[in-house]
């Protein structure tokens, strides 16, 4: 076996044929990282004229002039092949050490164990414990806070149809989709010049839910890098005011009284009725001559065998009445089926399902689109790091502990 450097297109050719891969292991992400001060490299293992393993790695000075070497979503290698992993990582470590590195950080897009949609191990399913053992033998330790989610939730699409998937959804999920359609909500793809719409909604969502949103420049760069290859989609769910109001008001009187009026209990115990956000919000926007409301947005990667639900946001004022976030998911699930993708990845969940967790609702939302047959929790190997220079690594660890005490 030979440890070699690759040209970006050589790496892409290998990655395109690799079965389990992440869009993070692409020249496009390398270019994105390069804009933020990282230097990209491409390494591989060649034997008898064939590449057996490869990785895009980026490096950046991070501590006292020493660099961290990072393989996001990689490397692309059979982690259960002890000889191959030993050869690759020893050579990669030596390269990093001779090029001013002190730490190697990897986040393999490689599953640890087969789990069902409730997060329970599948009887007779795969278990890649040997992959973890091989990493430990090489000196890797797992990190408790990976850059990308260790756990995600997916809908398997193999041998599925629109009709079957829809019928197998949770009843509430189906009802939310039907209601959004009845309210006249439409989903379309955003053009690059419309990404400000996407950013406006994700920013308000991040403020409401207390997380840091990406800058508009990030979304624009991702569009520029991946859209020419058909590997990213920014979508918006919208409703036209006149259409949605007329549909809403055309419902039977009894149902309309429940759906268009919400009740609030005031201090003396009396109940007063107030207009729903559907009519109130619509009236407010009508006064501003706005006829089309952006309700919800989503960013999806369409790479390899899966569609990945990466980022999203919704206008809080219209979430409950329009259910646009449900229609976006259904729109993209149908797209994934039409284009022959094998998996629809709802992406991150906070660990294995736990009803006591404050984030359980996120998992439950995603689970609602699946059945026991099609839904499953994905558990990856997780993020791992390997000291390249023991002296600088230990010094960095010591200073980090002192900083947090």
Predicted regions and their residues:
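Helix C-cap/helix->beta junction micro-motif
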Residues: 98-99, 183, 339
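A gly/proline- and charged-residue-enriched helix-loop-helix capping module
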Residues: 75-138
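A structural signal for short, well-ordered beta-strand segments and their strand-loop junctions
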Residues: 102-107, 188-190, 343-346
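Flexible, glycine- and charge-enriched loops at secondary-structure boundaries
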Residues: 81-85, 121, 125, 166, ...
């Amino acid at each position: 076996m030979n440890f070699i450097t690759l040209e970006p297109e050589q790496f892409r050719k290998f990655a395109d044929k690799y079965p389990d891969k992440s869009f993070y292991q692409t020249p496009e992400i390398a270019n994105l990282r390069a804009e933020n001060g990282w230097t990209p490299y491409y390494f591989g293992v060649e034997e008898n004229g064939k590449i057996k393993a490869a990785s895009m790695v980026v490096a950046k000075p991070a501590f006292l002039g020493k660099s961290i070497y990072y393989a996001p979503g990689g490397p692309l290698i059979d982690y259960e092949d002890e000889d191959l992993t030993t050869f690759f990582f020893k050579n990669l470590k030596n390269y990093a050490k001779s090029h001013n590195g002190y730490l190697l950080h990897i986040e393999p897009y490689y599953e640890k164990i087969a789990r069902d949609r409730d997060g329970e191990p599948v009887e007779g399913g795969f278990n890649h414990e040997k992959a973890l053992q091989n990493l430990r033998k090489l000196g890797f330790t797992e990190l408790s806070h990976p850059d990308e989610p260790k756990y995600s939730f997916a809908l398997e699409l193999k041998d599925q149809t629109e009709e079957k998937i829809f019928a197998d959804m949770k009843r509430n999920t189906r009802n939310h989709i039907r209601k959004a359609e009845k309210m006249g909500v439409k989903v379309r793809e955003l053009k690059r010049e419309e990404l400000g719409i996407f950013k406006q909604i994700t920013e308000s969502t991040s403020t409401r839910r207390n997380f840091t949103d990406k800058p508009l420049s990030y979304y624009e760069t991702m569009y520029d890098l991946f859209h020419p290859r058909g590997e990213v989609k920014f979508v918006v769910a919208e409703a036209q005011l006149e259409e949605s109001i007329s549909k809403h008001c055309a419902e039977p009187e009894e149902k309309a009284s429940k759906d268009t009026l919400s009740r609030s209990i005031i201090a003396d115990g009396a109940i007063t009725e107030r207009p729903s956000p559907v009519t109130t919000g619509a009236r407010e926007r009508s006064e501003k001559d706005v006829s089309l409301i952006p309700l919800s947005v989503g960013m999806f990667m369409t790479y390899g065998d899966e569609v990945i639900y990466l980022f999203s946001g919704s206008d809080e004022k219209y979430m409950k009445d329009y259910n646009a976030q449900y229609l976006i998911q259904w729109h993209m699930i149908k797209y994934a089926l039409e284009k022959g993708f094998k998996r629809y990845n709802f992406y991150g969940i906070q660990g294995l399902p736990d009803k006591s967790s404050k984030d359980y609702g996120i998992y439950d939302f995603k689970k609602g689109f699946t059945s026991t047959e099609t839904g499953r929790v994905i558990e990856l190997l997780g993020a791992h790091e390997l000291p390249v220079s023991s002296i600088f690594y230990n010094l960095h660890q010591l200073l980090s502990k002192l900083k947090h005490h």
